[in-house]
A protein has these predicted regions:
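Alpha-helical transmembrane segments of multi-pass membrane transport proteins
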Residues: 1-433
Protein backbone atom coordinates (compact mmCIF):
# COMPACT_ATOMS: atom_id res chain seq x y z
CA UNK A 1 0.00 0.00 0.00
CA UNK A 2 2.82 2.40 0.91
CA UNK A 3 4.40 1.94 -2.52
CA UNK A 4 1.10 2.88 -4.21
CA UNK A 5 0.91 6.02 -2.07
CA UNK A 6 4.49 6.97 -3.03
CA UNK A 7 3.79 6.39 -6.73
CA UNK A 8 0.57 8.43 -6.52
CA UNK A 9 2.22 11.28 -4.60
CA UNK A 10 5.30 11.74 -6.79
CA UNK A 11 3.67 10.64 -10.05
CA UNK A 12 0.83 13.12 -9.66
CA UNK A 13 3.25 15.87 -8.61
CA UNK A 14 5.66 15.48 -11.54
CA UNK A 15 2.85 15.11 -14.11
CA UNK A 16 1.21 18.32 -12.88
CA UNK A 17 4.54 20.21 -12.92
CA UNK A 18 5.29 18.87 -16.41
CA UNK A 19 1.98 20.17 -17.81
CA UNK A 20 2.59 23.61 -16.31
CA UNK A 21 0.55 23.66 -13.10
CA UNK A 22 2.19 26.00 -10.51
CA UNK A 23 4.36 24.04 -8.09
CA UNK A 24 2.42 25.03 -4.97
CA UNK A 25 -0.86 23.73 -6.45
CA UNK A 26 0.92 20.64 -7.80
CA UNK A 27 2.09 19.87 -4.27
CA UNK A 28 -1.39 20.44 -2.83
CA UNK A 29 -3.22 18.31 -5.43
CA UNK A 30 -0.64 15.50 -5.18
CA UNK A 31 -0.96 15.55 -1.39
CA UNK A 32 -4.76 15.29 -1.54
CA UNK A 33 -4.54 12.47 -4.11
CA UNK A 34 -2.17 10.46 -1.91
CA UNK A 35 -4.22 11.06 1.24
CA UNK A 36 -7.34 9.74 -0.51
CA UNK A 37 -5.57 6.38 -0.58
CA UNK A 38 -5.11 6.57 3.20
CA UNK A 39 -8.36 8.15 4.41
CA UNK A 40 -11.96 8.80 3.33
CA UNK A 41 -12.59 12.03 1.42
CA UNK A 42 -13.82 14.08 4.38
CA UNK A 43 -10.92 13.10 6.65
CA UNK A 44 -8.39 13.68 3.84
CA UNK A 45 -9.76 17.20 3.21
CA UNK A 46 -9.69 18.06 6.91
CA UNK A 47 -6.16 16.67 7.30
CA UNK A 48 -4.80 18.69 4.36
CA UNK A 49 -6.45 21.85 5.70
CA UNK A 50 -5.03 21.27 9.18
CA UNK A 51 -1.53 20.63 7.86
CA UNK A 52 -1.69 23.75 5.67
CA UNK A 53 -2.70 25.85 8.68
CA UNK A 54 -0.07 24.23 10.91
CA UNK A 55 2.59 24.87 8.28
CA UNK A 56 1.90 28.60 8.41
CA UNK A 57 1.40 28.80 12.18
CA UNK A 58 5.04 29.50 12.94
CA UNK A 59 6.38 32.79 14.32
CA UNK A 60 9.76 32.26 12.61
CA UNK A 61 8.04 32.48 9.20
CA UNK A 62 7.67 36.23 9.76
CA UNK A 63 11.36 36.55 8.89
CA UNK A 64 10.62 35.64 5.27
CA UNK A 65 8.31 38.57 4.30
CA UNK A 66 10.52 41.03 6.18
CA UNK A 67 13.73 39.88 4.46
CA UNK A 68 11.91 39.80 1.10
CA UNK A 69 10.74 43.41 1.55
CA UNK A 70 14.23 44.46 2.66
CA UNK A 71 15.66 42.85 -0.47
CA UNK A 72 13.07 44.58 -2.67
CA UNK A 73 14.01 47.96 -1.19
CA UNK A 74 17.71 47.23 -1.78
CA UNK A 75 17.13 46.30 -5.41
CA UNK A 76 15.70 49.77 -6.05
CA UNK A 77 17.84 51.67 -3.56
CA UNK A 78 21.03 52.34 -5.52
CA UNK A 79 23.02 49.82 -3.51
CA UNK A 80 24.32 47.78 -6.47
CA UNK A 81 26.36 50.59 -8.06
CA UNK A 82 28.01 51.43 -4.72
CA UNK A 83 28.99 47.79 -4.18
CA UNK A 84 30.32 47.58 -7.75
CA UNK A 85 32.50 50.66 -7.18
CA UNK A 86 33.87 49.12 -3.98
CA UNK A 87 34.55 45.80 -5.72
CA UNK A 88 36.39 47.62 -8.51
CA UNK A 89 38.72 49.20 -5.96
CA UNK A 90 39.36 45.81 -4.33
CA UNK A 91 40.11 43.67 -7.42
CA UNK A 92 40.60 46.21 -10.20
CA UNK A 93 44.25 45.26 -10.82
CA UNK A 94 43.65 41.51 -11.16
CA UNK A 95 43.70 40.04 -14.74
CA UNK A 96 40.15 40.14 -16.06
CA UNK A 97 39.39 42.72 -13.41
CA UNK A 98 35.82 43.47 -14.49
CA UNK A 99 34.99 39.76 -14.27
CA UNK A 100 36.29 39.67 -10.70
CA UNK A 101 34.39 42.87 -9.93
CA UNK A 102 31.26 41.10 -11.15
CA UNK A 103 31.88 38.11 -8.85
CA UNK A 104 32.67 40.20 -5.79
CA UNK A 105 29.74 42.57 -6.34
CA UNK A 106 27.38 39.62 -6.80
CA UNK A 107 28.61 38.04 -3.57
CA UNK A 108 28.02 41.25 -1.62
CA UNK A 109 24.73 42.22 -3.28
CA UNK A 110 23.36 38.67 -3.20
CA UNK A 111 24.10 38.31 0.49
CA UNK A 112 22.45 41.65 1.31
CA UNK A 113 19.38 41.22 -0.95
CA UNK A 114 19.02 37.46 -0.55
CA UNK A 115 18.16 37.03 -4.24
CA UNK A 116 20.36 35.57 -6.97
CA UNK A 117 18.01 36.84 -9.67
CA UNK A 118 18.11 40.40 -8.29
CA UNK A 119 21.92 40.23 -8.07
CA UNK A 120 22.24 38.99 -11.66
CA UNK A 121 19.95 41.77 -12.91
CA UNK A 122 21.45 44.61 -10.87
CA UNK A 123 25.14 43.75 -11.24
CA UNK A 124 24.94 42.35 -14.76
CA UNK A 125 22.83 45.26 -15.98
CA UNK A 126 25.51 47.68 -14.81
CA UNK A 127 28.70 45.80 -15.71
CA UNK A 128 27.88 43.93 -18.94
CA UNK A 129 27.82 47.07 -21.17
CA UNK A 130 31.12 48.26 -19.64
CA UNK A 131 32.72 44.84 -20.19
CA UNK A 132 31.59 44.77 -23.82
CA UNK A 133 33.14 48.21 -24.43
CA UNK A 134 36.46 46.96 -23.01
CA UNK A 135 36.54 43.96 -25.37
CA UNK A 136 35.08 41.22 -23.18
CA UNK A 137 33.17 38.48 -24.98
CA UNK A 138 29.48 39.03 -24.04
CA UNK A 139 28.98 35.28 -23.54
CA UNK A 140 31.92 35.16 -21.12
CA UNK A 141 30.66 38.21 -19.22
CA UNK A 142 27.20 36.66 -18.93
CA UNK A 143 28.65 33.31 -17.80
CA UNK A 144 30.61 35.06 -15.03
CA UNK A 145 27.54 37.02 -13.95
CA UNK A 146 25.22 34.01 -13.91
CA UNK A 147 27.63 31.67 -12.13
CA UNK A 148 28.56 34.22 -9.46
CA UNK A 149 25.09 35.55 -8.63
CA UNK A 150 24.28 32.34 -6.72
CA UNK A 151 27.19 32.66 -4.29
CA UNK A 152 25.46 35.30 -2.17
CA UNK A 153 22.60 32.89 -1.33
CA UNK A 154 24.84 31.07 1.14
CA UNK A 155 26.13 34.26 2.76
CA UNK A 156 23.64 35.53 5.38
CA UNK A 157 21.06 36.74 5.74
CA UNK A 158 19.50 34.05 3.53
CA UNK A 159 15.80 33.27 3.08
CA UNK A 160 16.56 29.77 1.78
CA UNK A 161 18.45 28.88 4.97
CA UNK A 162 15.47 30.10 7.02
CA UNK A 163 13.17 27.85 4.97
CA UNK A 164 15.54 24.92 5.55
CA UNK A 165 15.62 25.64 9.28
CA UNK A 166 11.82 25.49 9.50
CA UNK A 167 11.56 22.39 7.31
CA UNK A 168 14.27 20.58 9.26
CA UNK A 169 12.40 21.01 12.52
CA UNK A 170 14.02 24.11 13.96
CA UNK A 171 17.73 23.82 13.17
CA UNK A 172 19.41 26.94 14.58
CA UNK A 173 19.14 29.83 12.12
CA UNK A 174 22.19 31.51 13.68
CA UNK A 175 24.26 28.33 13.15
CA UNK A 176 23.09 28.05 9.54
CA UNK A 177 23.83 31.71 8.87
CA UNK A 178 27.37 31.48 10.23
CA UNK A 179 27.94 28.13 8.51
CA UNK A 180 27.18 29.71 5.13
CA UNK A 181 30.05 32.19 5.09
CA UNK A 182 32.99 29.94 4.15
CA UNK A 183 31.06 27.81 1.60
CA UNK A 184 29.70 30.97 -0.05
CA UNK A 185 33.18 32.48 -0.23
CA UNK A 186 34.57 29.15 -1.51
CA UNK A 187 32.06 29.08 -4.37
CA UNK A 188 32.90 32.71 -5.19
CA UNK A 189 36.63 31.91 -5.23
CA UNK A 190 36.00 28.93 -7.52
CA UNK A 191 34.29 31.23 -10.03
CA UNK A 192 37.07 33.84 -9.69
CA UNK A 193 39.79 31.25 -10.36
CA UNK A 194 38.14 30.15 -13.61
CA UNK A 195 37.47 33.78 -14.54
CA UNK A 196 41.12 34.72 -13.92
CA UNK A 197 42.50 31.82 -15.98
CA UNK A 198 40.27 32.53 -18.97
CA UNK A 199 40.81 36.30 -18.75
CA UNK A 200 44.60 35.90 -18.68
CA UNK A 201 44.55 33.59 -21.71
CA UNK A 202 42.41 36.05 -23.67
CA UNK A 203 44.33 39.12 -22.55
CA UNK A 204 41.41 41.03 -21.09
CA UNK A 205 42.51 44.44 -19.76
CA UNK A 206 43.08 45.59 -16.19
CA UNK A 207 41.14 48.48 -14.72
CA UNK A 208 42.89 51.73 -13.89
CA UNK A 209 44.47 51.83 -10.45
CA UNK A 210 42.23 53.70 -8.02
CA UNK A 211 43.74 56.58 -6.08
CA UNK A 212 43.62 56.56 -2.30
CA UNK A 213 40.90 59.22 -2.38
CA UNK A 214 38.82 57.15 -4.83
CA UNK A 215 39.24 54.05 -2.67
CA UNK A 216 38.14 55.91 0.46
CA UNK A 217 35.12 57.37 -1.34
CA UNK A 218 34.06 53.96 -2.69
CA UNK A 219 34.40 52.40 0.77
CA UNK A 220 32.47 55.17 2.52
CA UNK A 221 29.70 55.09 -0.12
CA UNK A 222 29.26 51.32 0.30
CA UNK A 223 29.75 51.23 4.09
CA UNK A 224 26.11 51.95 5.04
CA UNK A 225 24.97 49.03 2.86
CA UNK A 226 27.58 46.67 4.29
CA UNK A 227 26.66 47.66 7.83
CA UNK A 228 23.32 45.90 7.41
CA UNK A 229 25.03 42.50 7.54
CA UNK A 230 26.99 43.47 10.67
CA UNK A 231 23.87 44.81 12.38
CA UNK A 232 21.79 41.71 11.59
CA UNK A 233 24.45 39.10 12.35
CA UNK A 234 25.91 41.01 15.29
CA UNK A 235 22.48 41.32 16.87
CA UNK A 236 21.68 37.63 16.39
CA UNK A 237 25.03 36.39 17.68
CA UNK A 238 25.03 38.86 20.55
CA UNK A 239 21.63 37.66 21.69
CA UNK A 240 20.16 41.14 21.24
CA UNK A 241 17.40 39.87 18.94
CA UNK A 242 16.26 36.72 17.17
CA UNK A 243 16.51 36.08 13.42
CA UNK A 244 12.84 37.02 13.06
CA UNK A 245 13.33 40.30 14.90
CA UNK A 246 16.50 40.90 12.88
CA UNK A 247 14.45 40.72 9.68
CA UNK A 248 12.21 43.57 10.89
CA UNK A 249 15.28 45.62 11.84
CA UNK A 250 16.67 44.95 8.35
CA UNK A 251 13.51 46.47 6.83
CA UNK A 252 13.76 49.59 9.00
CA UNK A 253 17.46 50.04 8.25
CA UNK A 254 17.03 49.44 4.51
CA UNK A 255 14.06 51.82 4.39
CA UNK A 256 16.11 54.58 6.03
CA UNK A 257 19.03 53.89 3.69
CA UNK A 258 17.06 53.71 0.42
CA UNK A 259 14.48 56.43 1.08
CA UNK A 260 16.17 58.93 3.39
CA UNK A 261 19.94 58.53 2.86
CA UNK A 262 20.49 57.48 -0.78
CA UNK A 263 17.07 58.88 -1.84
CA UNK A 264 16.88 56.43 -4.73
CA UNK A 265 13.44 55.17 -3.63
CA UNK A 266 10.68 57.79 -3.64
CA UNK A 267 7.61 57.66 -1.43
CA UNK A 268 5.43 57.12 -4.50
CA UNK A 269 7.40 53.95 -5.31
CA UNK A 270 6.61 52.26 -1.98
CA UNK A 271 3.13 50.87 -2.82
CA UNK A 272 4.54 49.09 -5.88
CA UNK A 273 7.50 47.69 -3.90
CA UNK A 274 5.20 46.53 -1.10
CA UNK A 275 2.95 44.79 -3.65
CA UNK A 276 5.95 43.01 -5.21
CA UNK A 277 7.00 41.81 -1.76
CA UNK A 278 3.48 40.63 -0.91
CA UNK A 279 3.23 38.61 -4.13
CA UNK A 280 6.63 36.97 -3.57
CA UNK A 281 5.80 36.27 0.08
CA UNK A 282 2.45 34.73 -0.87
CA UNK A 283 4.16 32.31 -3.23
CA UNK A 284 6.73 31.24 -0.61
CA UNK A 285 4.19 30.85 2.20
CA UNK A 286 1.73 28.91 0.05
CA UNK A 287 4.57 26.57 -0.91
CA UNK A 288 5.54 26.24 2.73
CA UNK A 289 2.02 25.39 3.87
CA UNK A 290 1.34 22.79 1.18
CA UNK A 291 4.82 21.27 1.62
CA UNK A 292 4.11 20.59 5.29
CA UNK A 293 1.09 18.56 4.19
CA UNK A 294 3.19 16.72 1.61
CA UNK A 295 5.89 15.99 4.19
CA UNK A 296 3.26 14.63 6.57
CA UNK A 297 1.87 12.38 3.83
CA UNK A 298 5.36 11.11 3.00
CA UNK A 299 6.14 10.38 6.64
CA UNK A 300 2.78 8.69 7.20
CA UNK A 301 3.45 6.44 4.20
CA UNK A 302 7.05 5.71 5.35
CA UNK A 303 8.42 7.14 2.10
CA UNK A 304 11.64 8.53 3.68
CA UNK A 305 12.37 5.09 5.11
CA UNK A 306 11.70 3.44 1.75
CA UNK A 307 14.14 5.81 0.03
CA UNK A 308 16.67 5.33 2.85
CA UNK A 309 16.47 1.55 2.47
CA UNK A 310 16.87 1.87 -1.30
CA UNK A 311 19.99 4.04 -0.95
CA UNK A 312 21.46 1.82 1.76
CA UNK A 313 20.81 -1.14 -0.52
CA UNK A 314 23.09 0.38 -3.13
CA UNK A 315 25.95 0.98 -0.68
CA UNK A 316 26.58 1.37 3.03
CA UNK A 317 29.55 3.67 2.36
CA UNK A 318 28.67 7.20 3.60
CA UNK A 319 30.79 8.77 0.84
CA UNK A 320 28.80 6.96 -1.85
CA UNK A 321 25.44 7.75 -0.21
CA UNK A 322 26.29 11.48 -0.02
CA UNK A 323 27.39 11.40 -3.65
CA UNK A 324 24.07 9.81 -4.64
CA UNK A 325 22.13 12.43 -2.65
CA UNK A 326 24.08 15.18 -4.40
CA UNK A 327 23.38 13.66 -7.82
CA UNK A 328 19.65 13.45 -7.07
CA UNK A 329 19.58 17.06 -5.82
CA UNK A 330 21.49 18.28 -8.89
CA UNK A 331 18.86 16.61 -11.09
CA UNK A 332 16.06 18.06 -8.94
CA UNK A 333 17.64 21.53 -9.24
CA UNK A 334 17.40 21.32 -13.03
CA UNK A 335 13.60 21.08 -12.90
CA UNK A 336 12.64 22.79 -9.64
CA UNK A 337 13.35 26.11 -7.95
CA UNK A 338 15.21 26.18 -4.64
CA UNK A 339 12.40 26.83 -2.17
CA UNK A 340 10.07 23.98 -3.22
CA UNK A 341 13.06 21.65 -3.55
CA UNK A 342 14.15 22.42 0.02
CA UNK A 343 10.60 22.02 1.31
CA UNK A 344 10.02 18.68 -0.43
CA UNK A 345 13.38 16.92 -0.21
CA UNK A 346 14.64 17.97 3.23
CA UNK A 347 12.25 15.55 5.01
CA UNK A 348 13.44 12.77 2.68
CA UNK A 349 17.22 13.21 2.77
CA UNK A 350 17.89 14.79 6.17
CA UNK A 351 17.05 11.60 8.14
CA UNK A 352 19.39 9.64 5.85
CA UNK A 353 22.18 12.18 6.37
CA UNK A 354 21.68 12.11 10.14
CA UNK A 355 21.78 8.31 10.08
CA UNK A 356 25.21 8.64 8.45
CA UNK A 357 26.30 10.94 11.30
CA UNK A 358 26.07 14.19 9.29
CA UNK A 359 25.25 17.33 11.23
CA UNK A 360 21.94 18.95 10.12
CA UNK A 361 23.69 22.32 9.73
CA UNK A 362 26.30 20.77 7.44
CA UNK A 363 23.58 19.00 5.45
CA UNK A 364 21.60 22.23 5.06
CA UNK A 365 24.59 24.09 3.66
CA UNK A 366 25.40 21.20 1.31
CA UNK A 367 21.79 21.07 0.09
CA UNK A 368 21.52 24.81 -0.54
CA UNK A 369 24.93 24.92 -2.28
CA UNK A 370 23.81 22.04 -4.50
CA UNK A 371 20.46 23.59 -5.41
CA UNK A 372 22.17 26.93 -6.15
CA UNK A 373 23.81 25.26 -9.15
CA UNK A 374 20.34 24.42 -10.46
CA UNK A 375 19.66 28.15 -10.86
CA UNK A 376 22.21 28.12 -13.71
CA UNK A 377 20.68 25.16 -15.50
CA UNK A 378 17.83 25.14 -18.04
CA UNK A 379 14.89 24.61 -18.26
CA UNK A 380 14.04 26.23 -14.88
CA UNK A 381 17.29 28.10 -14.19
CA UNK A 382 15.91 31.51 -13.24
CA UNK A 383 19.35 33.12 -12.84
CA UNK A 384 20.34 31.83 -16.28
CA UNK A 385 17.27 33.33 -17.97
CA UNK A 386 17.64 36.68 -16.20
CA UNK A 387 21.36 36.88 -17.00
CA UNK A 388 20.69 36.17 -20.68
CA UNK A 389 17.83 38.65 -20.88
CA UNK A 390 20.03 41.37 -19.36
CA UNK A 391 22.96 40.78 -21.74
CA UNK A 392 21.01 39.73 -24.84
CA UNK A 393 23.06 36.52 -25.21
CA UNK A 394 21.04 33.48 -26.29
CA UNK A 395 20.99 30.55 -23.87
CA UNK A 396 22.33 28.11 -26.47
CA UNK A 397 25.39 30.36 -26.91
CA UNK A 398 26.01 30.41 -23.16
CA UNK A 399 26.16 26.68 -22.39
CA UNK A 400 29.75 26.18 -23.59
CA UNK A 401 31.19 29.26 -21.77
CA UNK A 402 29.39 28.09 -18.60
CA UNK A 403 30.95 24.61 -18.56
CA UNK A 404 34.24 25.60 -16.82
CA UNK A 405 32.23 27.45 -14.17
CA UNK A 406 29.95 24.44 -13.68
CA UNK A 407 33.03 22.29 -13.15
CA UNK A 408 34.51 24.71 -10.61
CA UNK A 409 31.23 24.94 -8.69
CA UNK A 410 30.92 21.13 -8.63
CA UNK A 411 34.44 20.87 -7.18
CA UNK A 412 33.46 23.42 -4.53
CA UNK A 413 30.28 21.40 -3.82
CA UNK A 414 32.30 18.22 -3.30
CA UNK A 415 34.62 20.07 -0.90
CA UNK A 416 31.61 21.39 1.04
CA UNK A 417 30.15 17.87 1.15
CA UNK A 418 33.22 15.94 2.25
CA UNK A 419 35.00 18.53 4.41
CA UNK A 420 32.51 19.31 7.20
CA UNK A 421 34.72 21.96 8.80
CA UNK A 422 34.22 24.27 5.83
CA UNK A 423 30.64 24.64 7.07
CA UNK A 424 31.03 23.96 10.79
CA UNK A 425 34.25 25.80 11.67
CA UNK A 426 32.72 29.25 12.28
CA UNK A 427 29.62 28.04 14.19
CA UNK A 428 31.83 25.87 16.41
CA UNK A 429 34.32 28.70 16.89
CA UNK A 430 31.51 30.98 18.07
CA UNK A 431 30.08 28.32 20.39
CA UNK A 432 26.84 27.94 18.43
CA UNK A 433 27.17 24.15 18.22
Amino acid sequence: MDSYIAITLFGCFFVLVFIGVPISFSIGIATVASMLLMFPWDIAAITVSQRLANGLDNFALLAIPFFIFAGTLMNSGGIAIRLINLAQVMVGRVPGSLGHVNVLANMMFGSISGSAVAAAAAVGGTLNPIQTKQGYDPAFSTAVNVSSCITGLLIPPSNVLIVFSLTAGGVSVASLFMAGYLPGILMGLAVMIVCGIIAKRRGYPLSERATFAQACKAFLDALPSLLLVFIVMGGILGGIFTATEASAIAVVYTFILSVLVYREVKWRHLPKLILESVVTTSIVLLLSGFSVGMSWAMTNADIPYMISDALMGISDNPLIILLLINIVLLIVGIFMDMTPAVLIFTPIFLPIAQELGMDPVHFGIMMVANLCIGLLTPPVGSALFVGCSISGVKIQHLIKPLLPFYAALLVALMMITYIPQISLFIPQLLGLM
